[in-house]
């Protein structure tokens, strides 16, 4: 820098000694002023460069400290060193640019006439240099932050690895006892003759000759038994099953009930190992029909319909004791039929015959919904009280309807109940099925029906 100043001074003296005009002096003064500004700028740049070199020196010290503290993280330190090398390269670029600036000043010695233009160019380059130096400062701050963060991460990783190594050192199995074998990181059980692992990887005894009565069930060894004759009690003892232990008592019972001698007309016939008990009878008078012993010739006893009945004790015929009034009952499924709806409901109907009429008394019952028409069916083939035949319910006439009745009902729709009535009439009896036609009445929308007790009757001789 001092050489540059001396050179400029010599040039100024040379110009002065040549007797330039006042205008030249003015230009020289301007040049001096610009040179002073350039000198001030160069000094400021030098100070900035010195500051950067100081920061680089501090950074080198910190990098050295990091290298000594985290030697095991060489890869990351290498990256930091490459970053520092990049910074050094940037500083070398700055030195190169400063050398270029010196070269340009040397050119200014030879081209003093173009000093204004060179000075402007120098100011522009100096401004760019300041920008680059500021960028370098920012990069150094980012690098410092990154180094600090990476160092903390490295310390945390080292601490975690140290904890895991401590755990491994504590839990690691280095030797095994008798019956075990350690191969690398695996521990095996030494299995001798007479032992094996089942499909659940459980060590078991190996019995090669289980036919002798021993075997395994789950994880236990048991005695093999024939469960048809033997079982285990609550104490694990082998006991006889009931079908075996009860044989003596059953044998004694059979022996006690054995018939050795029979009286006529019975006789015992033996054929080989078979003993047959036979009934002796006179074939002229008796015959076995459908495994039943009957007379070959007998009088046919007539059958009687109500109100007549046969007293088998003395073979006498008399008026039935329930003539004029006879009680009974039928229980079964009340069927409802329409082309689009069909359901069954269990009901119990009390039967009462008065003279030549059969009265059906229905108790209170509930059913599913009905339509405005349809028919109800009672099947008297089954469900009648003892003494009541299916034919005793057959009507004595085929007039349709045989009779009608008004049935009080309630139509139910959710919580709503509507009182109503239906007109029912006995229409037909066919092979024990009595049809009751639904002729109409009041009607409303509903889901279920409650039927009040009702009676319906029709002519019937029984």
UniProtKB/Swiss-Prot annotation:
Q: Where is this region: Tail?
A: 1-317
Which SUPFAM superfamilies does the protein's record reference? Tropomyosin (SSF57997), Virus attachment protein globular domain (SSF49835)
Q: How is it modified after translation?
A: Undergoes dramatic conformational rearrangements during viral disassembly in the endocytic pathway.
Any keyword Translocase?
no
Q: Which Pfam families match?
A: Reo_sigma1
Q: Name one GO cellular component term.
A: viral outer capsid
Known glycosylation sites:
237, 243, 297, 413
Q: Give the source's domain of life in one word.
A: Viruses
Region annotation (Head) maps to: 318-462
Which InterPro entries does the entry link to?
A: Adenovirus_pIV-like_att, S1_C
Going by the UniProt record, its keywords in alphabetical order are: Capsid protein, Coiled coil, Glycoprotein, Hemagglutinin, Host-virus interaction, Outer capsid protein, Viral attachment to host cell, Virion, Virus entry into host cell
| Compartments reported by the entry | Virion
Tell me, what is an example of a GO biological process annotation in this record? cell adhesion
Annotated coiled-coil segments of the chain = 18-49
Describe its partners and assembly state. Homotrimer. Interacts (via the head region) with human F11R.
* Family to which this protein belongs: Belongs to the orthoreovirus sigma-1 protein family.
The free-text function statement in the UniProt record for this protein reads:
Fiber-like molecule that attaches the virion to the host cell membrane by binding to the primary receptor F11R/JAM-A and to sialic acid containing proteins (coreceptor). The interaction of sigma-1 with F11R is required for NF-kB activation and apoptosis. Binding to both sialic acid and F11R is required to induce maximal levels of apoptosis.
Which protein is depicted? Outer capsid protein sigma-1
Q: Which organism encodes this protein? A: Reovirus type 2 (strain D5/Jones) (T2J)
Q: Which gene encodes it?
A: S1
